[in-house]
């Protein structure tokens, strides 16, 4: 990100390399110098194939999906008698994306996507809890949803439900909090830090912009 006056320019890359960082910085310079609202920079071409162009919608028949779901239901319920409900579902998606840039350049992509989710309801002494887990990826059903994968999903959904069933309510209400050095500072930053940033105070959009040399926190904050 680069800032010049009221102009902010962003540049990003999907590739983590020294060259991509260098190109991004050069793009920022060109954008800030441009008088137009956007900078039309050519996209580097790549033949890297991260996933196949299979269509998961044609991958399995309805009956084969029902058979797998029945196996999933049977396997999950066999894990413990306190399991009262099992819900499993598949999601298949096939997208064809085409981007036409202002200069006439055309870029297209075929994107398959499969998703598998399991929800497990457990009950003990009248108390019910739910565990939900799922996986997904740009692959076909056959490549992704094998026995090993879906059993892991069922196991994890049941584990989460069991943890919830045996969990205790977290303490609530007002309480004293002591923050040490290091990562706890993020809590302070998210609570008030953005309002203390220079741009917001310069533009007088922050609640603190006119409170210079005045107390803005309770006496307990040191």
Label every PLM stretch briefly.
Residues 1, 10-12, 117-119, 176-178, ...:
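Structured core elements
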Residues 1-31:
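N-terminal cap/recognition module
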Residues 1-4, 108-139:
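Short beta-strand elements
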Residues 3, 8, 85, 102, ...:
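Broad gene-expression machinery/nucleic-acid interaction feature
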Residues 3, 119-123, 178-180, 189, ...:
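Generic beta-strand/beta-sheet core signal
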Residues 19-110, 142-185, 206-209:
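Acidic low-complexity segments
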Residues 106-119, 195-205:
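Acidic, His- and aromatic-enriched active-site or binding-groove loops in soluble protein domains
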Residues 186, 191-222:
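Conserved, structured C-terminal
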């Amino acid at each position: 990100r680069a800032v010049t006056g009221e102009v902010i320019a962003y540049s990003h890359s999907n590739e983590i390399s020294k060259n991509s960082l260098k190109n991004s910085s050069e793009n920022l310079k060109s954008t800030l110098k441009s008088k137009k609202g956007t900078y039309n920079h050519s996209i580097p071409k790549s033949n890297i194939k991260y996933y196949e162009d299979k269509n998961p919608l044609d991958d399995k028949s309805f009956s084969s999906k029902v058979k797998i779901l029945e196996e999933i239901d049977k396997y999950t319920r066999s894990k413990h008698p306190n399991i009262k409900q099992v819900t499993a579902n598949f999601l298949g998606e096939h997208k064809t994306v085409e981007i036409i840039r202002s200069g006439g350049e055309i870029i297209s992509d075929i994107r398959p996507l499969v998703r598998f989710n399991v929800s497990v309801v457990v009950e003990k002494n009248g108390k019910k809890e739910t565990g939900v887990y799922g996986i997904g990826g740009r692959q076909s059903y056959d490549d992704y949803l094998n026995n090993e994968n879906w059993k892991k999903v069922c196991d994890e959904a049941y584990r989460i439900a069991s943890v919830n069933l045996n969990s205790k309510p977290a303490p609530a209400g007002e309480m004293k909090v002591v923050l040490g050095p290091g990562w706890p500072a993020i809590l302070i930053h998210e609570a008030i830090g953005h309002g203390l940033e220079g741009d917001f105070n310069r533009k007088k959009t922050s609640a603190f912009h006119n409170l210079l040399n005045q107390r803005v926190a309770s006496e307990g904050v040191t």
